Each structure stands twice: as structure tokens, then as C-alpha cells.
Amino acid sequence: MSTSAVRVEALAVDVTFTEHNLRVVLADGCEISAPLEWFPRLKAATPEKRTNWRLIGPGVGVHWEEVDEDISVESLLAA
């Protein structure tokens, strides 16, 4: 009997911030939280600039144009 692994891609659907953390909500309802310390440009950005984000493709990552920052969901899951 053979089995094969099914790769399910985690996709972001929303981004929020707390005072010290970036929080990414995934399509399956899971949430990833990471300290802003890991992302110096986001940490230094104003709250208004942090909320000006867009998804990369179908949600494989998040892009902040004004902050010049891109973060992939895969990198957050690997951390």
C-alpha cells in the first residue's frame, strides 16, 4: 500500500498588531504571532503605516509598501 503526503499551503487572510506583536490570521482560522522585534522596519513604522498592508498573491505573504517589508507565511511558520 502506498501513501502520499498532501501538502496544504497556509494562506494569510488578515493581519493585526498588538503593542509588541505581529499577528497573522490564516485561512484555516489558526493565528501566528511573532514579536515586532523580529521586524525592525515594522517596529519603527507608525500604526497607520503598519495597517497599510496587502496580501501577496492568494495570501502566501504580506507586503507593506510604505515600510518596504515583505513577510511570508512560510517564514513565520518556520520560526
Q: Which sequence ranges carry the predicted segments?
A:
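Motif-centric detector for short Cys/His coordination patterns
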Residues: 1-79
